[in-house]
Amino acid sequence: MKFVVRSIAFATLAMCAFGAFAQKGETVKIAYIDPLTGLLGPVGNNGLRGFQFFAEKFNKTNPAGVKFEVVAFDNKLSPAESLNALKAATDQGIRYITQGNGSGVAGAIIEAVNKHNERNPGKEIIFLNYAAVDPDFTNSKCSYWHFRYDADTSMKMEGLTTFMKDRPETKKVFLLNQNYSHGHQVAKFFKEGISRKRPDIQIVGEDLHPLGQVRDFAPYIAKIKASGADSIVTGNWGSDLQLFVKAANEGGFTGNFYTYYTSVTGTPTALGKTGEGRVFQIGNGHARMGGEMDKWQDEYKAKLNDDFYTGQIINIYTTLSEAMAKSKSTDPVKVAAALSGMKTKSVFNGEIEVRKTDHQLQQALFITVWGKVDKKYSYSMENTGMTMIPVKQYPNYVSSTPTSCQMKRPA
């Protein structure tokens, strides 16, 4: 497996050639709207620390010479609270918005951003979606002002079902997901993908549960074991995966997990030494990508006593600063035009592209498996002595999925 690694310094030198420092020293505020309290608060706080940590890194050297400042808003995982936070942010003159936890929230923000920009010409805002993966956001509900940096569910499930196709031991699957758009889409795209690639696999059960409300998953585990499932497919994240895994361990489920978010706060600790070789994740990276990424990951842990697992944050700062350099402006209208269709090199994930047709980032994806740290994959997640070890890489031309987006662009 070969990873393409480039430093921010390289990007800086490249952009200097374009006379990119027109905005040097200008402060660019980014409103971070995510849950900072409640059961899913630990995930939101991890994301906030990631944005703040890499703001400091990029403030030292970025091709536009701007200074990034992150302003946090606790949305309590509520669409209504998120819209209040968005209003507060725009009232403060903040014109860049980011959010990632909960597609229900992201959908509300997209609609609100569209309305704001229609009603307030000259005060446009951009939504930098770092983790909400409902495919509709870059298909039927696509927006010129929305840019998604995580791979959407259709992309992730295309990779995951391709991987599962070649695992003959997987014969009976139970789907357990959160009862909102993301969970619905995980189930939908799994069924579509596996029926094409492994029609012999049986779906022996399916359940949905309230987002961020269940504290005891033992009844779900009992149902899964009774179904005869040898594998679970879940898009759960945060406490909903952490507590689910805990219940599986306590309930004696010894089958495979196919997940999106095993790396996310709390789940590594819940897994501990269990699950070796049978808990899989699809994502845009892993714990030892090489080069500068390894250095940053270790520094992040030493400074914050936390794991960094959201590489999308780095790609946001990379593309945003390059777009500001290219447009010689921090005006969202000019920056959006520069972002749309941008191709560049990620610090950790090779060639990436902000696809012009729908603003979905095109990037490589990896299948990883829970296993013991070793010399090559030495990063201990949540100090468990375990890590996510890469077993398969899908280049961006493989992970890419088509779009039906008919984007309305500014005149």
Predicted segments with their positions:
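Short, low-complexity disordered leader/linker segments with a strong preference
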Residues: 1-29, 91, 404, 408-411
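Signal peptide-proximal N-terminal region
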Residues: 24-25, 48-70, 195-200
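Solvent-exposed, acidic/polar segments of extracytosolic/periplasmic ligand-binding ectodomains
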Residues: 26-28, 343, 347-411
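Beta-alpha junction/loop-to-helix N-cap segments that form part of ligand/metal-binding clefts
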Residues: 27, 42-46, 61-137, 149, ...
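Extracytoplasmic "Venus flytrap"
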Residues: 27-52, 73-80, 101-102, 176-185, ...
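Extracellular/periplasmic Venus flytrap/periplasmic-binding protein
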Residues: 81-84, 135-136, 144-252, 287-295
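Periplasmic-binding protein-like
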Residues: 89-103, 120-130, 172-177, 228-238, ...
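Extracellular/periplasmic periplasmic-binding protein-like sensory domains
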Residues: 143, 245-317, 324-330, 383-410
